[in-house]
Amino acid sequence: MPAIVIVGAQWGDEGKGKATDLLGGRVDYVVKPNGGNNAGHTVVVGGEKYELKLLPAGILSPNAVPIIGNGCVVNLEALFQEIDGLEARGADTSKLRVSANAHLVAPYHQVLDKVTERFLGSRAIGTTGRGIGPAYMDKVARLGIRVQDVFDASILRQKVEGSLRQKNELLVKVYNRRDIEVDEIVDYFLSFAERLRPLVIDSTYVLNTALDEGKVVLMEGGQATFLDVDHGTYPFVTSSNPTAGGASVGSGIGPTRISRSIGIIKAYTTRVGAGPFPTELFDEMGMYLQKTGGEFGVNTGRPRRCGWYDAVLARHASRVNGFTDYFVTKLDVLTGIEQIPVCVAYDVDGVRHDEMPMTQTEFHHAKPIFEYFEGWTEDITGARTLEDLPENAKNYVLALEKLSGTRFSAIGVGPDRDQTIVVNDLIND
């Protein structure tokens, strides 16, 4: 069987965890190809809410093998805290595996992340302070420490020494902080070696062998399209490529083996942290969406900025990722709103743009051009087919599908796994 990739189509928090959980019972492997414990996601199973950060949502699917891929950066302390938290609630994490080539987040990465944000002041990106950006910087600069290095104390020490030679200069001379001892970091990593060893695999070999054997592999991207370091609203982005192409690189699965690229998109739009957001609401309606949708970050608790659905973004995300399907979430949050605006184009300094503006400056100047749709008041959480939806809700969904340029194959009408309208099978159709 070919592989399937799930990608956030906005700025994150679209409900990728729900989509993964819905499909998890039908797949054999769920791999997280990018990011670290900076991207939280919520999964509701049997009325119980689980807030995951570093672990793939597939950890809660009893039949799937969850894998942290080579494209991730792993905070070992956070990893085992999350595992322990799930096991304390009765979840089975014994199938979890971690790529030997994944990079590690060191304590000094977290220190650098926080002091850099403070140093930038009003120009801060709004990171989670988890050290993800600095860890990816070290990866690209060839100063990174990988999972496999924890099992060779000599190599580990050499790499820590090389990295700290640069980091301590920065910490002491620029940020007026104390230097960090090599032994402190080496001992920190070695303390996890025994527990980590049984989890570590050659993930590229395992996943491709599984595909050769006809198994189904689901790649669960973190963050989202417009946080991608290449395709997002740079510089207000993450440090990896949470797009479909990045999922291929971060899992070691070649692009020709991917059969479905599924975009996860909210029926409205949210964003955490700084950066442009054309449809953002600054009034009571924005507060209403925030409260009704529970729009607060899993990782930081920060309130999410809320706005209307942006079809320009949806079309661009579909183009970048080659989406075959969209999975729309949180349609139920819009229940009770009398009239629902949808952004169909932008006004940039008096010029209409039907597609994403080319430059950062233009996007910062973009003002939404809206079309308006009649709302509904009926409870839709029990709907399981399009025909079950009130006429106005159905019209809204069909309009978004047409404006977004990609078929809507699933629609979330509530937080639970079964509160979903499946229009087209997301694996076999």
From Swiss-Prot:
Reaction(s) the record says it catalyses: IMP + L-aspartate + GTP = N(6)-(1,2-dicarboxyethyl)-AMP + GDP + phosphate + 2 H(+)
Protein origin, superkingdom: Bacteria
Residues the record marks as active site: 13 (proton acceptor), 41 (proton donor)
Keywords associated with the record: Cytoplasm, GTP-binding, Ligase, Magnesium, Metal-binding, Nucleotide-binding, Purine biosynthesis
One GO molecular-function entry: magnesium ion binding
Matches recorded under Gene3D superfamilies: Adenylosuccinate Synthetase, subunit A, domain 1, Adenylosuccinate Synthetase, subunit A, domain 2, Adenylosuccinate Synthetase, subunit A, domain 3
Binding site for IMP: 13-16, 38-41, 128, 142, 223, 238, 302
Pathway annotation: Purine metabolism; AMP biosynthesis via de novo pathway; AMP from IMP: step 1/2
Cofactor note: Binds 1 Mg(2+) ion per subunit.
Keyword field contains Cell division: no
Binding positions for Mg(2+) per the UniProt entry: 13, 40
The protein's enzyme class: ligase
Principal location: cytoplasm
Matches recorded under InterPro entries: Adenylosuccin_syn_GTP-bd, Adenylosuccin_syn_Lys_AS, Adenylosuccinate_synth_dom1, Adenylosuccinate_synth_dom2, Adenylosuccinate_synth_dom3, Adenylosuccinate_synthetase, P-loop_NTPase
A single Gene Ontology CC term: cytoplasm
Subcellular localization: Cytoplasm
Pfam families: Adenylsucc_synt
EC numbers, comma separated: 6.3.4.4
GO biological process: 'de novo' AMP biosynthetic process; IMP metabolic process
Positions of GTP binding: 12-18, 40-42, 304, 330-332, 412-414
Cofactor (UniProt): Mg(2+)
Record's subunit section: Homodimer.
Family under the similarity heading: Belongs to the adenylosuccinate synthetase family.
Task performed by this protein: Plays an important role in the de novo pathway of purine nucleotide biosynthesis. Catalyzes the first committed step in the biosynthesis of AMP from IMP.
Protein's recorded name: Adenylosuccinate synthetase
Organism for this UniProt entry: Arthrobacter sp. (strain FB24)
Lineage summary: Bacteria, Bacillati, Actinomycetota, Actinomycetes, Micrococcales
Gene, per the UniProt record: purA
